[in-house]
């Protein structure tokens, strides 16, 4: 239920922003919750008889500013305007993914205690900041030492690193059923864990 409410709220915020209408900043359930939130928009691309998803844009905050209804609507509205040539028509043909971020805590880079598929990373290096969500780790095969190499290649030597827990809610089809992604069950992570054990 939370996933459906959250994705529906985000989609409404994006649609209203694209139409020039006020963005819904409250919700009976979401206004009671506090969490960081990332919103991702993926277009459905059909080519050669296959269908794939292509990220159009992603934006978020690692710590809550206000409540989840307010924060998710503001992030979604800003994202809708930041995607080049993004229209109502594009939104109707796109799937929405919302990642909740909770429990931000310092992390020394210990890979042995890292919960692959459940945790993400927030890194600060000077004026550079980087967020790596669990889905990015799987898509780019950033498991084990590859994650630390990726961080260094993106921001240089990190001054501070944090990890956080996530819950990922995802539309199966545009405006369709919403599921909670269980990335820790992915084949990529299982194969990695078999090798390191």
From Swiss-Prot:
Origin: domain of life: Archaea
Residues in AMMECR1 domain copies: 1-190
Protein name: Protein PAE0830
Species of origin: Pyrobaculum aerophilum (strain ATCC 51768 / DSM 7523 / JCM 9630 / CIP 104966 / NBRC 100827 / IM2)
């Amino acid at each position: 239920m939370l996933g459906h409410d959250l994705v529906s709220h985000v989609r409404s915020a994006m649609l209203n922003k694209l139409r020039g209408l006020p963005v819904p900043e409250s919700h009976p359930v979401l206004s009671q919750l506090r969490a960081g939130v990332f919103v991702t928009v993926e277009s459905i691309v059909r080519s050669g008889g296959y269908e794939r998803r292509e990220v159009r844009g992603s934006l978020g905050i690692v710590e809550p500013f206000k409540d989840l209804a307010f924060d998710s609507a503001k992030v979604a509205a800003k994202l809708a305007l930041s995607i080049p040539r993004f229209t109502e028509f594009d939104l109707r043909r796109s799937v929405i993914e919302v990642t909740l971020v909770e429990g931000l805590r310092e992390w020394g880079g210990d890979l042995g205690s890292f919960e692959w598929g459940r945790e993400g990373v927030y890194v600060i290096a000077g004026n550079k900041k980087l967020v790596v969500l669990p889905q990015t780790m799987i898509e780019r095969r950033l498991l084990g030492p590859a994650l630390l190499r990726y961080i260094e290649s993106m921001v240089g030597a990190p001054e501070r690193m944090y990890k956080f827990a996530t819950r990922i809610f995802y539309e199966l089809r545009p405006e369709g059923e919403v599921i909670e992604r269980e990335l820790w069950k992915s084949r990529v992570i299982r194969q990695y864990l078999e090798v390191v054990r």
